[in-house]
Each structure stands twice: as C-alpha cells, then as structure tokens.
C-alpha cells in the first residue's frame, strides 16, 4: 500500500508554496535542497516549524516543498501556511489550535504600489513652502 501523503498550498506576498507531508523523521526539503541550505536565516526556519510546534507533531512528518516567487521572508510565510493547511488533512481536530495561532489565515498584506509623482509608494520630495 502506498504511503499516506498530505498536500497543502500556502501563499504569502508574491510567494506560492506547494507542500507535501509524508510520515517520517521531520526532514524538510525546499526546492530539492535541505531547509538549512535553502533558507539561511534561523528565525525564518523557526517560522516554518511553527505549525508543528502548535500541533505537537515535531519530527513526525517529512516535508517536501516547491516554492516560487518572493524573497526568503515571503517564502517562509508561504511554507508555514502550506504546512498548516496540510496538517488539517492529517487531523481536522488541529483546526482549532492552528486557527487560534493564526496559521490558517492568509496574510493579505501586499506591497503598496508606487504612485506617479512620488519617489516610492508614499515618499515624496521635500515640501518647500516658499
């Protein structure tokens, strides 16, 4: 019989992560690289592990991620969102704890667009009264 696989899709800023959970030892692979190799910042790796900490399932699943778009921060948030959604398929009882931790909510904050006549989205040149 084939091993159980659980899938979830996560999004954050411009990043989209397709996540697969397979029962295993807790190894996380992002775009065919180890997570320590792919994401250099330890605090971002902690963000990725949050859903496992909330549901007390650390080391129970191997995670395979395909992520595109955005930078390290956006990709980490997308992976976290995808893992949380995949854990819901593992056990629907996780919904309450994941929802309370805010891990199932898609963070809708996006980069504000640059406006014409301004240097950035809100930065204008210095105002001179006279």
Swiss-Prot record:
Signal sequence region: none
Ribosomal protein is among the record's keywords:
yes
Give the superkingdom in one word: Bacteria
Gene Ontology terms describing biological process? translation
Which terms in the GO cellular component ontology are assigned? cytosolic small ribosomal subunit
In the record, the note on similarity to other proteins reads: Belongs to the universal ribosomal protein uS9 family.
* NCBIfam families to which the protein is assigned, alphabetical: PRK00132.1
Q: Which HAMAP family match?
A: Ribosomal_uS9_B (MF_00532_B)
> What name is this protein filed under?
Small ribosomal subunit protein uS9
- Organism of this sequence: Streptococcus pyogenes serotype M1
């Amino acid at each position: 019989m084939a091993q159980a696989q659980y899938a979830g899709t996560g999004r954050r800023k411009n990043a989209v992560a397709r996540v697969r959970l397979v029962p295993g030892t807790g190894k996380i692979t992002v775009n065919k690289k180890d997570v320590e190799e792919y994401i250099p910042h330890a605090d971002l790796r902690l963000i990725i592990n949050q859903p496992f900490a909330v549901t007390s399932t650390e080391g129970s699943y191997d995670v395979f991620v395909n992520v595109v778009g955005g930078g390290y921060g956006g990709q980490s948030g997308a992976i976290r969102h995808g893992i949380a959604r995949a854990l819901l398929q593992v056990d629907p009882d996780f919904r309450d704890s994941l929802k309370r931790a805010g891990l199932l909510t898609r963070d809708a904050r996006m980069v504000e667009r640059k406006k014409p006549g301004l240097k950035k989205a809100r930065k204008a040149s210095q105002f001179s009264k006279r």
